Amino acid sequence: SQAVCAMIQRVLQAQGLPAGLIGFVQGAGIEVGVGLIRHPLIAAGAFTGSTRGGAALQAEANARPRPIPFYGELGSINPLVALPAALAAKGAELATTLAGSISLGCGQFCTNPGLLVLVDGPETDAFIQQLTPALAQQKPHPMLTAGMRKAFDAGVQALVDAGASSLLQGEGVAPAPGPQLLQVSAQRFIEHAELREEVFGPSSLIVRCASLAEVPQVLAAVGGSLTVTVWGADEDTAAHRAIVRSATQIAGRVLFAGVPTGVAVTAAQQHGGPWPASTSPMTTSVGDAALERFLRPVCLQDAPAWLLARGGVPC
């Protein structure tokens, strides 16, 4: 962060822009973020982090004498629905791809596929047999902080305590965790909110549905997500329509191929979603439209000629 800030300052100087255009504040405690949100000269806030931290900062933004916009990107479990048709066609290839996505960056991507929604059947049984060893071969690097590693271990244990069974308990080498794969029934997932908590790290929870009809119910229980991935919905069927409809209702980005961990910075990107994925699902925190979060429209009615000549910018 310090190196990037130094580079930014050099660019500002080279372009003749004010040195204070972009600032850098560093600190380990929550008081740093709270202090920034409370500062009277701050006109808007943005945040990427935990649901708990984002909710606290949003409350601070709303508690100001003059509340300010707050754009928080919070928790997301990013369901990946792998339908039997896709697994039958290329299950082994998809298992390898998915294992890499789960462990990418030690699972510390906000778009990490933390929930795998599968439908009972021979294709699913075979896929799990392919995914488990593929994931076991992954060697995650250490997490960003010791606190994050501790939270990861606690999160995995919380899933077990809520009724999930472990399919893979990768043995990490401290301070790096091992990959984890767990499994639970769709009904239990729907009934127990603890199973829907984000576990930030190299793990994924398989939710097994008894039929295609249960898939939309599982997605609805998630509530909000940055992404939903749907593999195998290539045919126009009533079941596929229902699944895709549910996906669009809870996510900002719905993928029909690939994995969600890649987030392209493009005009078409939508990186946000209903709570708890973000505090403002109408906006994106990645892509061209992300700049619009910090712009405010102003109408200049019957403006004088001098102001029009300046393009509406008074000074």
What are these regions (language model features)?
Residues S1-Q9:
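Substrate-binding/gating loop at the entrance of the active-site cleft, primarily
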Residues R10-G16, L21, R38-H39, A44, ...:
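ALDH superfamily catalytic-core signature
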Residues L21-F24, A44-F47, T227-V230:
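Short catalytic-loop micro-motif centered on adjacent basic/acidic residues
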Residues F24-G27, A82, L205-A210:
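Short acidic-hydrophobic, aromatic-tinged amphipathic segments that line or gate anion-handling sites
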Residues E31-V32, E214:
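Short acidic active-site motifs
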Residues L41-I42, G100, L116-L118, P122, ...:
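Conserved C-terminal structural/oligomerization subdomain of aldehyde/semialdehyde dehydrogenase
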